[in-house]
């Protein structure tokens, strides 16, 4: 189930999705252009695959992943340290009534996809997929 869906199965509103995409583009642009002067952030390429907005659009959960999946904790700490600056930059680039507060989280989807791939390659699953029956 995508992160934007509530446990009841309702999908996120189109406005939340649109604003989340605008914030995602703004954060990704700031990070890619070297707008934050931090040694950790300057030495890492950071992808921003998703931003999830709260219903009132005042809180943005920004999912990030350093390229290569290494040094997640230092990158997250550096982003947290500069979150006020990033919030101000997002406010300048995205026209909203309130600048959303940014919360940074590591995107776990890549690790989860790799774990599932590894499970699918196990002999027991390969046997099930090929249609062989146990006797």
Swiss-Prot record:
Pfam families: RBFA. InterPro entries: KH_dom-like_a/b, RbfA, RbfA_dom_sf, Ribosome-bd_factorA_CS. It is found in: Cytoplasm. PROSITE patterns: RBFA. Keywords: Cytoplasm, Ribosome biogenesis. GO terms for biological process: maturation of SSU-rRNA. One of its GO terms (molecular function) is ribosomal small subunit binding. Disulfide bonds: none annotated. One of its GO terms (cellular component) is cytosol. One of several proteins that assist in the late maturation steps of the functional core of the 30S ribosomal subunit. Associates with free 30S ribosomal subunits (but not with 30S subunits that are part of 70S ribosomes or polysomes). Required for efficient processing of 16S rRNA. May interact with the 5'-terminal helix region of 16S rRNA. PANTHER family: RIBOSOME-BINDING FACTOR A, CHLOROPLASTIC-RELATED. Monomer. Binds 30S ribosomal subunits, but not 50S ribosomal subunits or 70S ribosomes. Belongs to the RbfA family. NCBIfam families: PRK00521.2-5, rbfA. This is Ribosome-binding factor A. It comes from Rhodopseudomonas palustris (strain HaA2).
